[in-house]
């Protein structure tokens, strides 16, 4: 996971560098950073949490997503101590913040910002459905994760508004 995340960081750093001349450094870094966080979210959530998962028998595989909102979540996770719900919120904050900051330079930013946050929510739904379909990765599909991810994206969107007001990407090139 770490190697894939670092390799993709190198790629998106080059993308930001290439865009910075045309869009300004704030927008270039924000948009490339948002794309990188979306890739890292996929890496974190669609690879097995532990290697050697083995085979998940069809009989023990879930047929549907858990609709038990706030149901049992582990107390900790290897990346971040605390609750898994806190982690699910935290991982979507950067994507929401960077997206809003990245589109703030354009007049259509007021339309693009909420559209991007909706897409982040749909991305969370897609991740959960893939976790359901790919039983071999031994992950669970849970509505609580979607709610927490959307909450994180919205918090990030609020942070992105504040960052846009401070950094004013529309004034820099």
Task: Name each model feature, range by range.
Residues 1-138, 158-173:
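Bulky hydrophobic segments
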């Amino acid at each position: 996971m770490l190697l894939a995340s670092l390799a993709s960081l190198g790629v998106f750093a080059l993308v930001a560098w290439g865009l910075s001349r045309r869009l300004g450094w704030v927008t270039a870094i924000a948009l490339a950073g948002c794309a990188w966080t979306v890739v890292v979210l996929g890496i974190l959530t669609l690879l097995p949490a532990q290697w050697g998962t083995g085979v998940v028998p069809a009989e023990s595989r879930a047929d549907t997503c858990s609709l038990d909102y706030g149901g049992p979540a582990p107390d900790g996770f290897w990346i971040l101590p605390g609750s898994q719900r806190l982690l699910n919120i935290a991982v979507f904050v950067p994507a929401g913040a960077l997206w809003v900051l990245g589109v703030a330079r354009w007049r259509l930013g007021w339309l693009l910002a909420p559209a991007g946050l909706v897409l982040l929510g749909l991305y969370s739904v897609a991740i959960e459905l893939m976790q359901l379909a790919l039983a071999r990765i031994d992950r669970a599909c849970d509505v609580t994760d979607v709610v927490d991810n959307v909450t994180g994206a919205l918090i990030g969107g609020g942070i992105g508004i504040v960052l846009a007001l401070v950094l004013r990407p529309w004034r820099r090139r």
